[in-house]
Amino acid sequence: PVGAAILLSFSYFNTIEPPTFVGFQNYIDLFTTDATFLQYVVPNTITYAVFVGVGGYILSFFLAWSLSQLTHGVRSVMAIIIYSPSMTGGILISKIWAVIFDGSETGYLNYLLMDWGIISEPIKWLQSSDWLLPVMIIVALWSSMGVGFLSILSGITNVNKELYEAARVDGIKNRWQEIIYVTIPSVRPQMLFGAVMA
């Protein structure tokens, strides 16, 4: 499919007639005549990719590290809660978020924000061009805590505790230094897998 899409990108194709080769004309038209593409599509795609890809990876590591500090029973329950969105079907996820981001006063988020006095009138989260991209990023981040998160969590929980003791003897003074000098180097394979899955 990817190869066919690349080949078709160099042709004129309307699904009725056979494709006609046009060279780079489609790309020239895309970057020179389509103002919407350069003004909205490219910046929104880059923003989405950075927040969901890079942000999701960092969030996976942070959540995995935070959970590794908890006791085994609490960690297991929290890991299931965090991982469960990746097992949930897309239709159910969309229904849940549609109720949360409902643009009326009865939408969960609007109700809470109005109750706390943060906003005075409901925001149409899913209809507003200002709020739609942030909402999409939040939903994507929430639903992307999947296999990458679990692999990083398993890597962190299996780091040899003697490495942390040796690091303290060598002069590591705080958790931040532990993360940089012990945790990250020890879970590099799991982090690579998490980056691929992000």
Model-identified regions with their sequence ranges:
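A structural signal for multi-pass alpha-helical bundles of membrane permease subunits
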Residues: 1-198
